């Protein structure tokens, strides 16, 4: 019986140390990658001739997070006359419509459009909301952000630069951070 216990202790100790070493390696290499990435220069774009981008944000009952998302989009380090923002308020029954209307009033000189759907045209999911937004889009490039994402100021510049530098690319994706990840069980799985 003591041989079994000794074997279990050795096995458990080995597993714990292995997991600890793997965790240390991941943190170390992650930090090294971060330091390397932080030194990457900002992509150079010809601001006069930058691609025109349509940014679409489908939103359903996202009043808690939509204001910060739109403000982050309005603050992009990208020529303001070279992108438009379309928020598709997909049949929300919270205060999303009011909040978005206030943002439009606060930013009258920006290309910022809100499409409010009703129970007939909306409420059929993200893909339907995006299809509604596509009808109004005029950009050479389409960027899609979820309503609970907060893109960093240079995010659009990096994405467009990547597309411009690689003719064979049809799409690119950037990293994101979700602000409401701890709100409920569903958002914890994101």
Predicted regions span which residues?
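Donor nucleotide-sugar binding loop of glycosyltransferases
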Residues: 62-65, 92
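Long helical/loop segments within the catalytic core of UDP-sugar-dependent glycosyltransferases
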Residues: 104, 108-109, 116-135, 153-190
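Cell-envelope/extracellular polymer assembly enzymes that use nucleotide-activated donors
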Residues: 51-54, 84
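N-terminal membrane-anchoring/stem segments of glycan-assembly enzymes
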Residues: 1-49
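Short, acidic, metal-binding catalytic loop of nucleotide-sugar glycosyltransferases
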Residues: 71-82
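A conserved acidic beta->alpha catalytic loop
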Residues: 80, 89-99, 119-121, 150
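Acidic helix N-cap motif at the loop->helix transition within catalytic regions
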Residues: 67, 94-103, 154
């Amino acid at each position: 019986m003591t041989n079994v216990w000794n074997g279990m202790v050795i096995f458990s100790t080995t597993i714990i140390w292995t997991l600890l070493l793997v965790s240390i390696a991941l943190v170390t290499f992650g930090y090294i990658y971060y330091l390397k990435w932080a030194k990457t220069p900002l992509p150079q774009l010809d601001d006069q001739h930058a691609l025109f981008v349509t940014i679409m944000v489908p939103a359903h009952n996202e009043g808690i997070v939509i204001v910060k998302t739109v403000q982050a989009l309005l603050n992009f380090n990208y020529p303001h006359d070279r992108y438009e923002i379309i928020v598709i308020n997909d049949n929300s029954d919270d205060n999303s419509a009011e909040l978005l209307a206030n943002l439009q009033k606060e930013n009258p000189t920006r290309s910022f459009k809100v499409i409010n759907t009703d129970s007939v045209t909306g409420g059929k999911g993200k893909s339907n909301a995006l299809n509604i937004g596509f009808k109004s889009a005029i950009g050479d490039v389409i960027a899609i952000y979820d309503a609970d994402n907060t893109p960093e100021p240079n995010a659009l510049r990096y994405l467009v630069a990547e597309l411009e530098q690689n003719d064979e690319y049809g799409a690119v994706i950037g990293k994101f951070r979700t602000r409401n990840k701890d709100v409920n069980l569903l958002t914890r799985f994101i």
